Amino acid sequence: MTIDHRSTGGSTTGGSTTGGSTTGRSFGEEGGRLTYGSYLRVPELLAQQIPQVVPPAHDELLFITVHQAYELWFQQLLHELTAVRDAMTTTQLWRARQLLRRAHVIERLLVSQIDVLETMTPQDFLEFRAALAPASGFQSVQFRELEFLSGAKDPGFLARFRSLTPAERRRLDGRLAEPSLWDAYLGLLASRGLPAGDDEQVLAALVEVARDRGRHDDLWQLAEDLLTHDELSGLWRARHVQMVERQIGTKSGTGGSTGAPYLHRRVPMRYYPLLWELRDWL
């Protein structure tokens, strides 16, 4: 007697009986297709943390992991903020606001990551700090891209940073040449018939936006989201310099900068000073 298993809805082969499957394969092994590890390239990812000091220093792995995580999040922020700018350029303000709010969450996460670094004592850091020279956070190309995209364009950085690869220089040149978030916002003001020339005109336009919420509430809300981006960036810089002082005091940076004094000078920088000045006129 021959049994047609297709009619039973089950299995007599010892494999899974769920849904009538007779494959005998485990979850995630459907014919060698994509898996969690292969999709995320986990083996390759975990091979990128390569401590430098001998004998090993326990906290060097933590230091590498945190900074690599920063670079991954910088990549994501560039992805989101570029899309924010493009959405403003095409007057999709709802989309720009949605992605800016996502960027805010990521930026708060970046501030909180400093707490992880501060679990490392100054003595722990000194076990491997000398091996970092002449590398420096100053050399983070993606961090500079974020500043340029946000509106703080500094062509002099390319001259000061002599170890840029050709690909890195092309990326930074591209960010300097393309419109910033602020450029895109000024374009929105102009599209509403508001003056967007010199700073005095822009400030007058912003005052009108703030005072006529009935007509311009979408522009007001978007400006507030840009200001939050500016505020969170400043919060990260302030938190970062505190962490540096806690670790190394006023020593020079590994890349040759003045260290904490240089970082202190960067803290007051604002991407959108006119949005801050606007408060004086409300």
Tell where the protein language model's regions lie, with residue ranges:
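Surface-exposed peri-terminal alpha-helical interaction modules
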Residues: 2-8, 20-282
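Short, low-complexity S/T/E/D/G/P-rich linear segments that nucleate or cap local secondary structure
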Residues: 11-18
